Amino acid sequence: MRLLVTGGSSFLGAWLCQRAAPNHDVVALHHSTALRLNGVTPMRVDLRRGRDVARLQAVGADAVVHVACKIKAPGPGEASAAEAAAQINRQLMDAVLALELPTVYASSTVVHWSQDTPYARSRREDERRLRESGLPYAILRPSAPYGPRLATHQPRHRESFHTLAALVQRSPVVPVIGDGTYRRQPVHVDDFSDAVLALLQAGLPSRAFEAGGGEALTMNAIIARLAALARRQPRVLHLPKALFVQAARLAPDFDPSLIAAADEDELADPAELEAQTGLVMRPFTDGARDLVR
């Protein structure tokens, strides 16, 4: 199968490409970040340009996996930066739908948040447009994807679990947003990728799936698991969420509204996905070994 993967230079997109490469002809789309993956054909494109979409239509792909997404874009203020990112995401989905191919969309558990953020609205809009397109599709909503570093590629944005694991292994103190009792259901990138490929192989069922890992854990428990594997005992420092929100305003790649909602639970029960694909998502306790070296 010839696959187009948008966001091929992202952590999740690159791992998906690498996982698919042994059995599929994979074309990884990237824009500003150089990409080199074994067995994968890189293709630099700007999906906002019609001529680049025309190039993709000539590739002869069998399906597209849409991973690319913008969280924050340049703008004079927080609201305009979030809206600029949302507009880019609309343009990306415009391009994907124009290909008129079976589509797997890597969405997010943020669609379930009770707090209404521009990013969550953008994800919900993408899902709605894909459902209404008439194309065969599958929507997967991963919770906290994680996995080992790539051997031949460095994504522009450092994967958050790599940052957390490094702190646990090297720092005497690990700062945590709020009380750390909010829950995540981390999914290993190999399991997520295998689920995408299994759905494509069987024929897309035109429905959405939660794509979490095999266990739900509080942030405090996640840190404890990493610390046990690393044989470390760092101090966990719980800090007010407002401090992180203020810091996010100064960082080019962080959306303050997302940090403000960070204490929402992000659970993603994989039972229906497992039943559909025959896979079993590994618990974080097992997969976390890939984060501690």
Spell out what each predicted region is.
Residues 163-187, 195, 199, 210:
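A conserved pocket-lining segment of Rossmann-fold NAD(P)-dependent short-chain dehydrogenase/reductase
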Residues 146-157, 178-189, 213-215:
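Glycine-rich "substrate-gating" loop/helix at the edge of Rossmann-like oxidoreductase active sites
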